[in-house]
Amino acid sequence: MSTNKRLRIAMQKKGRLSDESQELLKQCGVKINLQGQKLIAYAENLPIDILRVRDDDIPGLVFDGVVDLGIIGENVLEEEELTRTAAGDKVEYKMLRRLEFGGCRLSLAVDSDVEFDGPESLSDCRIATSYPQLLKRYMAEQGVPFKSILLNGSVEVAPRAGLADAICDLVSSGATLEANGLKEVEVIYRSKACLIQRKEPLSEEKQALVDKILTRIQGVQQADESKYIMLHAPKDKLEEITALLPGVENPTILPLAHDDTKVAVHVVSQENLFWETMEQLKEKGASSVLVLPIEKMLA
């Protein structure tokens, strides 16, 4: 059992995932200064230490029990898990929660003028990648033999440099591929950030803090996915109008001053309120429709 009294969380030192992880901690009420190049930062209001490391070091730190929690992309986590499993090493951790940021996809890409008719088009080809295990698993599932070329950066230049016939790399917008004369042809893995915990039991105090953080994360993510909707509805159309607004709980119905024919309706909706829905509400007689963002929510 871990005896250090402060909860240790590993997160990416820099990059988009780092920025989004910092924002999540901030929204969860963790006051911490992550400016500058400090490798370890300390929370001001909670017994939490943040270790800022390379993203591909985070899974190992959690697997080996060096830190208690890690915020990491699923692609990096699973690549390291497959690597250790292939080497016969033990892999132990707890998946606590998938996070709603850090989305990306791992895709196959070829020269823009190459015809692609499925993974079998790459039979016996050289494929450059920074994710050899995820690529190996996918190609094995497809029954396609290939040669893996391991590159730790600038994978997209491999075909033009004559190092590979195709690549397997992370894609966001596809602009980098296009700039290098490549086209995305097959998505082999979709990833988001996730929160993982060491397998070894934590102290009672630490576990209570982890549970508190998880509750706050749930509140933050529910708030991101929800909207607070307020409108005025004719009493004789109330049932039809509320049917258009699926909510977390039943709507709040309030009387309106100086108007006995209408009521105010307040509801927290977990579905996006599109223009089409608002137009349907208007057709049913709803008025003064307001759709507001929610910062925090505990359902």
Swiss-Prot record:
One of its GO terms (cellular component) is cytoplasm. Its EC number is 2.4.2.17. GO terms for molecular function: ATP binding; ATP phosphoribosyltransferase activity; magnesium ion binding. Keywords: Amino-acid biosynthesis, ATP-binding, Cytoplasm, Glycosyltransferase, Histidine biosynthesis, Magnesium, Metal-binding, Nucleotide-binding, Transferase. The keyword Ion transport does not apply. Pathway: Amino-acid biosynthesis; L-histidine biosynthesis; L-histidine from 5-phospho-alpha-D-ribose 1-diphosphate: step 1/9. One of its GO terms (biological process) is L-histidine biosynthetic process. Its main location: cytoplasm. InterPro entries: ATP-PRT_HisG_long (IPR020621), ATP_PRibTrfase_cat (IPR013820), ATP_PRibTrfase_CS (IPR018198), ATP_PRibTrfase_HisG (IPR001348), HisG_C (IPR013115), N-reg_PII-like_a/b (IPR011322), N-reg_PII/ATP_PRibTrfase_C (IPR015867). It catalyses: 1-(5-phospho-beta-D-ribosyl)-ATP + diphosphate = 5-phospho-alpha-D-ribose 1-diphosphate + ATP. Its cofactor is Mg(2+). Feedback inhibited by histidine. It is found in: Cytoplasm. Belongs to the ATP phosphoribosyltransferase family. Long subfamily. PANTHER family: ATP PHOSPHORIBOSYLTRANSFERASE, ATP PHOSPHORIBOSYLTRANSFERASE ATP-PRTASE. Catalyzes the condensation of ATP and 5-phosphoribose 1-diphosphate to form N'-(5'-phosphoribosyl)-ATP (PR-ATP). Has a crucial role in the pathway because the rate of histidine biosynthesis seems to be controlled primarily by regulation of HisG enzymatic activity. This is ATP phosphoribosyltransferase.
